[in-house]
Amino acid sequence: MHERYVPADVEAAAQSDWRAADAYRSKEDANRKKFYCVSMLPYPSGKLHMGHVRNYTINDVMYRYLRMNGYNTLMPMGWDAFGMPAENAAMANGVPPAQWTYENIAYMKKQMQSMGLAIDWSREVTTCKPDYYKWNQWLFLKMLEKGVAYKKTGTVNWDPVDQTVLANEQVIDGRGWRSGALVEKREIPMYYMRITQYADELLNDLDGLGWPERVKVMQHNWIGKSFGVNFGFPYELDGEKKLLRVFTTRADTIMGVTFCAIAAEHPLAARLARDKPALQAFIDECKRGGVAEADIATMEKKGVATGFSVSHPLTGEPVEVWIGNYVLMSYGEGAVMGVPAHDERDFAFAKKYGLPIRQVIAVEGETYSTDAWQEWYGDKTRAVCVNSGKYDGLAHDAAVDAIAAELKAGGLGDKQITYRLRDWGISRQRYWGTPIPIIHCPSCGDVPVPEQDLPVVLPEDLVPDGTGNPLAKSDAFLNCTCPKCGAAAKRETDTMDTFVDSAWYFSRYAAPDAQTMVDARTDYWMPMDQYIGGIEHAILHLLYSRFWAKVMRDLGLVAFGEPAKNLLTQGMVLNETFYREDAAGKKTWYNPADVTVSFDDKGRPVGAVLKSDGQPVELGGIEKMSKSKNNGVDPQMLIDHYGADTARLFTMFAAPPEQQLEWSGAGVDGASRFLRRVWAFGFANREALAVRAPFDAAQLAEADKTLRREIHGVLKQADFDYQRLQYNTVVSAAMKMLNAIEGAKGSTPAVLRETYGVLLRVLYPVVPHVTFELWKALGYADEFGPLLDAPWPKVDEAALEQAEIELVLQVNGKVRGALKVAKDASREAIEAAAVADEMFAKFAEGRPAKKIIVVPGRLVNVVV
C-alpha cells in the first residue's frame, strides 16, 4: 500500500481485478430476487458529457448497493446509433455515417470503462447493427399483418432546393437549415403505427407506475382524452349537400359561433381557392410553415376570409368560413368553430379581423367587456348559458347534454370521445436508419419482405450529400426482385423513426444473442426495476416504449405490458455562463475554465475577466451545460486530473439525483480532499486496522462504545438514504463516519477495524475504486472476500443503546442548557435533576419552581 493516494494507479488496479474476474457479467437465477437497472442508452455523439456521468453514476451506485444486499443485479449499456446527427457529420467530414458512429462508440465506451461502471458489456446493443434492427423490421411486419401498422399519406417539410424532407427542427423561420430555401408542406405516403388503439390502456396504466407525477401528467396530457361533441355545419357546394365537421369540448358555447376556420390542407380550402389567386397564395404560404404543433402554437395567427358561408346547425344563420394558419389538418377534423367570446385564440383572431364577438356564457353578478380578453367560462360550476334561446339558464353539463341531443336528433352530430394522441408516423426520408422492409412491385404493389430474407441490410458505405436520400441513388440497395411474382422491383427507401430503435432495446439486453427477437430470459429480467433518464424523454420515447411493450405482449412475445416499474428523471447539470456581445448583438460564449471571477464580501460574483486578455466578460447566469453556451466540463479531463472516484463523489454529493446540480470547482476539490483523507487514515493506521480480534461489545471501554454507537447510528441512516435514492446524504453520512473515526481517541484496534470497514462498505457504491483497493490492502478481502461481493454491513442495534440520554433543559420555555439523565430515569428523578442543575439556578434567579413539564426522551421545562 502506497502512502500517497494516486487515483490513476488505484483505479487501474481495481479495474484490472474486475476485468480478470469478469465481475459484472450477470446470469439469470430464479432463486434470487433480481434488480434490473437501466440508463437510457446514449446517442454516440463523440464524447460523454457531465449529464452522462451523473446518469450512469446514479445507476452504478444503485447496482452496487443492491448487489451488496443480495440482489441478482444487471446494468447493461448500448448505443442509440441511428439518426440525423450522423448524416450531418458525414456531410461535414466526407465520411460514411457508419464510420463516424463506430469511432464515436469506441471512444465513448473507453470513457465509460474509465469511470469504473458495473456494466455487463457482454450484453452491449448497437441499434445500427443488422442483428438488432432485423427485429425492428420483423416486428413491423407482424404489426402490418395485424393491422397495427398501416400506410397513408402524411404531411412533411420539403426543401425544394436540396430535394429532401426536413425534420421540424431543421426548419428555421420557414426555411431549410442548409439551403435557406422556403420550405413547402407536401403530402407523401408513409407508414404509421396505431398507438391510438392503445390510448385508453396507455392512460389507465399510468396509475400503477412508480414514475414521477410530473411525467405521468405530461403523458396524460399528451394522450389528451377529451369528452365532447362532434358535429357539422351544413353547406351546399357544386350541387352537393355536405357537413363541415368540427369537434368541441364546449358544446355549451355553440350559440356563440361567429366564424369557422379550416386548415390550408382541408379539401374545402382547395375547392374555395379555385380562381381566387389571393386565397391560393395564402394557402401556399401556410404550407410553407413548419408542421410541428409547437410551431403552430407560437406563430402569429393569420387568416383569410373565403367569402363562403356554412349554416349554423341550430339557428340556420350563415357562418363565415376562414382559412387559418393555426388550424392543423392532422388534428381533429381540420376545422374549428370560432367562439371569440369564450376562447382566447378565437378572441385574438376576431379582434384582429373585426369579427363579431357574441357572449353566450355568464356568471351572475359579473360584468363582461369585449375590450380585452376575460376568462368568461372558467367557472363551470356557476356559469350558465345566456343569449342562447331555449338553452338560457342551463349550466354547463345540462347545456352540453341538451345541445348534443338536438344535434343528434337532426342527424348533425353526437357526443364523442377523442384523443389528442395521433398515430405514430415512423417513415423517415433519411438514409441512416432501419430500412422499412417493403418492396414496390409494378404488378403486385407494396409487398412485405419475406421473414427469411430479413434483415434488409442498410449499406454502410454511402456518404450523404444533402440532396435527397442516398438509398434512392444506390442501385445495389434499390433494385431487387419481387418476392411474389419475380419481376424487377424497387425497395422502399424510407427508414424508420429512430424512436423505433429505442422502443425496446432494454428487452434485447436481456437476451442479446437470441435467435428470436426475445426469449425466456427477457421475461426474467423485464420489466426494468429502475429506468433512469432525462425529463426531456417524458413523452415521446417513454410513450412509444410503453406502446411497443403492449404490442409485444399482444403478439405473445413477452409477459409484461409496461417496460419500467420505476423511473428516475435526473436533474440537469448546470454551470456559469460568460459572454461578450458585439455591436451587431452577436454573443460569443466563453468557457468558465477560461474566466476569472471576482466576488463581493458575501461571496456573490460581481465581475469577470477573460484570462487570455484580462478584459471583462459579461456574467450570463447559471444554465444547463451545453455546447451552445460553451459552459461544459469535459469529463475526461476531470477523470484524468482527479480520478473517476472524485468525479463520481462530487456528482452524488452536490445534489439529490432528481434535482439540478450546480457545477463547482471548489466542490470537486473538496471531494478529492475527502478521498485523500480516507486513504491517509487507512495508510497511517494500517497496522492497527490489520488486527483481527473478536471483542465483547458489552465489555468495551466507553470510548469504543461511543465510536460504535456513532458509526452504527450513521450506518442506519445511510442504509435508509440508499433505499430512497438520496445519495447526497449517504455521502454526508460517510463524512460523519470518517470524522468520528479520525476523532476517536483510545479506540481498540479491533473496533477501529470494524468501524473503518463499515465506512469502506458505505462508500463503496459511490467510490468503488479507492474502497476496493483499501479493502484489499488492509486485509478485509482475506477475511470477508473481495468488496465486490461483500455483504452490506448490518446495524448493531445493541450498539445504539445508551445508558444515559440528553434532554433539552428549558426555563420558562426558553432553552437554557442540556440535562443528562439515566435512560430509564423516573419522572421524579428527572424533575430533581432539573432543579438541581446549575443552569436552572442561574436563570431561575432564586425563584422556586412552580411547575415542571417533562416530555419523555426530549425535554424538561421548568416554570418559575
From Swiss-Prot:
GO biological process terms held by the UniProt record: leucyl-tRNA aminoacylation
Q: What is its main location?
A: cytoplasm
EC category name: ligase
Which residues are connected by disulfide bridges in this protein? none
Residues annotated to bind ATP? K627
Instruction: Recite the UniProt keywords alphabetically.
Output: Aminoacyl-tRNA synthetase, ATP-binding, Cytoplasm, Ligase, Nucleotide-binding, Protein biosynthesis
The reply to whether Protein biosynthesis figures as a keyword in the UniProt entry is: yes
Recorded catalytic activity of this chain's protein: tRNA(Leu) + L-leucine + ATP = L-leucyl-tRNA(Leu) + AMP + diphosphate
The superkingdom of the source organism is Bacteria
SUPFAM superfamilies tied to this protein = Anticodon-binding domain of a subclass of class I aminoacyl-tRNA synthetases (SSF47323), Nucleotidylyl transferase (SSF52374), ValRS/IleRS/LeuRS editing domain (SSF50677)
What GO terms are given for molecular function? aminoacyl-tRNA deacylase activity; ATP binding; leucine-tRNA ligase activity
The short motif 'HIGH' region is annotated over 42-52
Q: Where is this motif: 'KMSKS' region?
A: 624-628
The family database entries (Gene3D superfamilies) matched by this protein are listed as: 2.20.28.290, 3.10.20.590, HUPs, Isoleucyl-tRNA Synthetase, Domain 1, Valyl/Leucyl/Isoleucyl-tRNA synthetase, editing domain
Q: Which family does it belong to?
A: Belongs to the class-I aminoacyl-tRNA synthetase family.
State the PANTHER family in the record: LEUCINE--TRNA LIGASE, MITOCHONDRIAL, LEUCYL-TRNA SYNTHETASE
Protein name per the record: Leucine--tRNA ligase
Q: What is the source species?
A: Burkholderia pseudomallei (strain 1710b)
Q: Which gene encodes it?
A: leuS
